[in-house]
Amino acid sequence: MTYCFDVDNTLCVTEGSDYRDSTPIKERIDYVNSLYEDGHTIYVLTARGMGSTNNNPIKAYAKYYNLTKEQLDSWNLKYHDLFLGKPGADIFVDDKGCLDKDFFSPKV
């Protein structure tokens, strides 16, 4: 199975756009790592930088890819690929969506 996880306020706590001070949610990182270890594919998708670049994924990538990758690696998150460029939105409607609190609540 393939899973795609958001970063801010899903895998870590982030206040506003203060990404440098994001703190990992260890229980969630551990659970994602267990999915990885069980052979699932793990993608990380974030909207970091999309608001400040007028939803320009190339500029968002240039601005935040290295910081985000360094954070994920320092948190020991196991994943297959990191994607920037998720459009900024207040609500995502998706037939395969799941609220983070619902996904993680019975596990952590």
What is each residue range found by the language model?
Residues 1-108:
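Catalytic phosphate/metal-binding cores of nucleic-acid and nucleotide-processing enzymes, i.e., regions
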